[in-house]
């Protein structure tokens, strides 16, 4: 595992490029044999245009094109939950024509395959279930809205709840030596 912190800054982008280049250089095949690469990121990804609306708004061109230029290999981008759904659907050995894949990580995402094809929805962003308004709370989500499902039921919400309980004096085995 290579330590890496995804952040919407030039340094994070350059570190990611360096990790990818290092990986490519470690391969025993010639770089020209690599047909394409796909980089999976969380958040809103438009696979048709190659834009990420969540990360690396650093250049005037689509993110997929930036990766292609900097890596030297045709690169596509995809939402992480949809990529996981693809992997599970095609690599999981299941005999099904439809699938749902729930990704509960730092945020919440859903990948949907219908008749073996990824479902993107009308806007191209289907599966962003973490931003469905569900709660009457004053917690501001990463998307800027209040009350999203992610504010109470996601990795970052669980961490926030844990920290609040510890600050209130609740004991936890996690805090023991």
Locations of regions flagged by a protein language model:
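Glycine-rich phosphate-binding loop and adjoining helix at the ATP-binding site
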Residues: 3-98
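Glycine/GP-enriched mid-protein hinge/lid loop-to-helix segment characteristic of carbohydrate kinases
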Residues: 7-15, 72-177
């Amino acid at each position: 595992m290579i330590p890496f912190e995804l952040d919407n800054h030039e340094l994070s982008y350059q570190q990611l490029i360096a990790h990818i280049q290092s990986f490519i250089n470690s391969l025993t095949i010639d770089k020209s044999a690599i047909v394409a690469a796909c980089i999976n990121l969380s958040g809103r990804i438009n696979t048709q245009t190659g834009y990420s609306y969540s990360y690396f708004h650093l250049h005037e061109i689509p993110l997929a094109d930036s990766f292609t230029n900097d890596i030297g290999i045709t690169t596509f981008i995809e939402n992480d939950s949809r990529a996981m759904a693809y992997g599970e659907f095609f690599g999981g050995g299941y005999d099904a024509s439809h699938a749902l894949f729930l990704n509960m990580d730092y945020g919440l995402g859903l990948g949907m395959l219908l008749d073996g094809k990824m479902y993107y929805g009308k806007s191209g962003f289907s599966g962003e279930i973490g931003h469905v308004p569900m709660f009457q709370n004053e917690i501001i989500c990463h998307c800027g809205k209040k009350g999203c499902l992610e504010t109470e039921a996601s990795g970052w919400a669980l961490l926030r709840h844990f920290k609040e309980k510890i600050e209130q004096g609740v004991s936890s085995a996690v805090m023991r030596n």
